[in-house]
């Protein structure tokens, strides 16, 4: 068992090393997109399925609540948290449209729409990102594996270089924490 524990920790460290190297410029670009949107009075909309939904909700909680700094709330919406909306849209339009209908309702040009998908192939996330771009939103996708079909529709795909879902999710939450930290610093420390 100890060998497996060490192997998993080694795999985690390899993902973190990749984030530090090849993904750092893309993370910086994501921070800039979010900061610019907030400075312009826009909002953040975030979505995912399963574990990615948990990450999306975590991201939104840090923006609306706070990450590290005592500051004003930042507008952000997790698109998977209202069960009545999800079940109504899912029943009437199909599961693939549960996020795109909400983007249609809530997103405005200049908003940042973030899709999270470990496989990069979640149809409901892809449809929502496509509609968001049509509406003039900025789009970020946190992906894994080879980025799947979503990498070609997101303005800024951040692909965690792993085929192992837990490692991809660890990469995603690390990216989310970095974005939250730097957005707060840019808006409430440097921006003063």
Curated annotation (Swiss-Prot):
<comment type="function">
    <text>Catalyzes the isomerization of sedoheptulose 7-phosphate in D-glycero-D-manno-heptose 7-phosphate.</text>
</comment>
<feature type="binding site">
    <location>
        <position position="169"/>
    </location>
    <ligand>
        <name>substrate</name>
    </ligand>
</feature>
<dbReference type="GO" id="GO:2001061">
    <property type="term" value="P:D-glycero-D-manno-heptose 7-phosphate biosynthetic process"/>
</dbReference>
<dbReference type="Pfam" id="PF13580">
    <property type="entry name" value="SIS_2"/>
</dbReference>
<keyword id="KW-0479">Metal-binding</keyword>
<feature type="binding site">
    <location>
        <begin position="117"/>
        <end position="119"/>
    </location>
    <ligand>
        <name>substrate</name>
    </ligand>
</feature>
<comment type="pathway">
    <text>Carbohydrate biosynthesis; D-glycero-D-manno-heptose 7-phosphate biosynthesis; D-glycero-alpha-D-manno-heptose 7-phosphate and D-glycero-beta-D-manno-heptose 7-phosphate from sedoheptulose 7-phosphate: step 1/1.</text>
</comment>
<keyword id="KW-0862">Zinc</keyword>
<dbReference type="GO" id="GO:0008968">
    <property type="term" value="F:D-sedoheptulose 7-phosphate isomerase activity"/>
</dbReference>
<feature type="domain" description="SIS">
    <location>
        <begin position="34"/>
        <end position="192"/>
    </location>
</feature>
<feature type="binding site">
    <location>
        <position position="169"/>
    </location>
    <ligand>
        <name>Zn(2+)</name>
    </ligand>
</feature>
<dbReference type="InterPro" id="IPR001347">
    <property type="entry name" value="SIS_dom"/>
</dbReference>
<feature type="binding site">
    <location>
        <begin position="91"/>
        <end position="92"/>
    </location>
    <ligand>
        <name>substrate</name>
    </ligand>
</feature>
<dbReference type="GO" id="GO:0005737">
    <property type="term" value="C:cytoplasm"/>
</dbReference>
<feature type="binding site">
    <location>
        <position position="177"/>
    </location>
    <ligand>
        <name>Zn(2+)</name>
    </ligand>
</feature>
<keyword id="KW-0413">Isomerase</keyword>
<feature type="binding site">
    <location>
        <position position="122"/>
    </location>
    <ligand>
        <name>substrate</name>
    </ligand>
</feature>
<protein>
    <recommendedName>
        <fullName>Phosphoheptose isomerase</fullName>
        <ecNumber>5.3.1.28</ecNumber>
    </recommendedName>
</protein>
<dbReference type="InterPro" id="IPR004515">
    <property type="entry name" value="Phosphoheptose_Isoase"/>
</dbReference>
<feature type="binding site">
    <location>
        <position position="58"/>
    </location>
    <ligand>
        <name>Zn(2+)</name>
    </ligand>
</feature>
<feature type="binding site">
    <location>
        <position position="62"/>
    </location>
    <ligand>
        <name>Zn(2+)</name>
    </ligand>
</feature>
<dbReference type="InterPro" id="IPR050099">
    <property type="entry name" value="SIS_GmhA/DiaA_subfam"/>
</dbReference>
<feature type="binding site">
    <location>
        <begin position="49"/>
        <end position="51"/>
    </location>
    <ligand>
        <name>substrate</name>
    </ligand>
</feature>
<dbReference type="InterPro" id="IPR046348">
    <property type="entry name" value="SIS_dom_sf"/>
</dbReference>
<dbReference type="InterPro" id="IPR035461">
    <property type="entry name" value="GmhA/DiaA"/>
</dbReference>
<keyword id="KW-0119">Carbohydrate metabolism</keyword>
<feature type="binding site">
    <location>
        <position position="62"/>
    </location>
    <ligand>
        <name>substrate</name>
    </ligand>
</feature>
<dbReference type="GO" id="GO:0005975">
    <property type="term" value="P:carbohydrate metabolic process"/>
</dbReference>
<comment type="subunit">
    <text>Homotetramer.</text>
</comment>
<comment type="similarity">
    <text>Belongs to the SIS family. GmhA subfamily.</text>
</comment>
<dbReference type="GO" id="GO:0008270">
    <property type="term" value="F:zinc ion binding"/>
</dbReference>
<keyword id="KW-0963">Cytoplasm</keyword>
<dbReference type="GO" id="GO:0097367">
    <property type="term" value="F:carbohydrate derivative binding"/>
</dbReference>
